Amino acid sequence: GKDVTHRWPELCDLAGSVNASTAILDAELVVFDDHGRPDFGLVQQSGFGTDREAVLHVFDVLSIDRTDTIGLAYLDRRRLLEALVEPSDNWLIPAHRVGDGTALLAATAAHQLEGVIAKRVDSVYHPGTRAKDWIKIKNRTVVELVVGGYTEGTGHRAGTFGALLL
């Protein structure tokens, strides 16, 4: 892998907040926009002299002190994770909720967030694959538009639309 430590120095102290000698965590860097919403584009810009700091969202634990945890149920891994990582301003364990997913999805829509990841509480971790036990449910925005034209596709889009002119 490529060392990118210099881009996010705010994350360098994470190891000191992990209550183990070694751990493998599943996490994602998040940078928030001016409205407090995650913005992937800002993640790409962060660490290059911008004033926006990234926050590491730690979702899961795959190993603790060289002991594999991927075969444990999600709720068991979640309990281990909460005992393992001490949150700070620069990393956190996002809140999770059991039940009433419909209300949670509606709340994310009201805040103009992307959606939720629904996980079976008894699911094991499947590295490198999409598992049916974890489903990404996105909020959809419906907009009525008039199509004024299109461009022809090229490359992998050959024989289809390249772009719609709206």
Please state what every model-predicted region is.
Residues 1-165:
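Catalytic cores of nucleic-acid ligases and guanylyltransferases
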